[in-house]
Amino acid sequence: MVNPSDTPAPDPGHPQDSAREGQEFIAQVHQKMSRLVQEFANGAINRTQFHRLYDRYQRQIMTVAQLIAESDPSMWRDAVMESEDTLHLKKRLTAKAVGMSVYDNRSGMPIETLGEFAVEADLIVPMLSSYRSAAAEIFRAGMRNTEMENGQWLCFVPGKHTTLIALFSLEPSDNQLATIERMHQDFEEANRAALEAEHIDPDRLAYPFYAFVQHRARPDNGGDEK
């Protein structure tokens, strides 16, 4: 089983090398996430193990990427070495992932909804149908974003078996979109056998984006994360 503590942080080098080493660290963690997906797909770990380990890796990546973008990229090493339970990303005026819903491409019905996905089905169904029609006309069409009347944004992420619909509080950044696209790819790979079955049991699926939604949907109370 993948152990999150075995993710090595490079030894400090020259300041000008900090950003490059940070990117190398992120690449190493991405490799570990891919192995984690395969372990769940092969039945080697359970859902709880998958969710907690995937969440820890994703938070490492987001923290390092944020600090690399700041004025002193060398700070990322110290952040990675801190406890995962007490590490908090700096508060910024960024979009929050309010909720996500996964739809079965075969039936057009929702498989699971996470977070506070307060969007009426009467609105989602025609939008999803329109999106699929447009995607069918464009080979390998990618994700689409649309702004709602209340200022929130809906993001449609296509997959082989499912379509992920993500609800953001504001317009998401390119990095946020890349994150949910990767999470959706991992969702389909981890649950490949279950999604190919005639009947899909949502309680047997692993959801890489579960923690992504929960952490951003919960109000700030200053307490430690569980």
Protein language model features and the residues they cover:
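Terminus-proximal functional modules
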Residues: 17, 21-24, 28, 32-35, ...
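Acidic, negatively charged sequence signal
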Residues: 48, 72, 80-83
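Acidic, low-complexity cytosolic segments
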Residues: 80-95, 106-226
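Short, charge/polar-rich alpha-helical segments
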Residues: 2-24
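Generic short beta-strand
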Residues: 100-101, 108
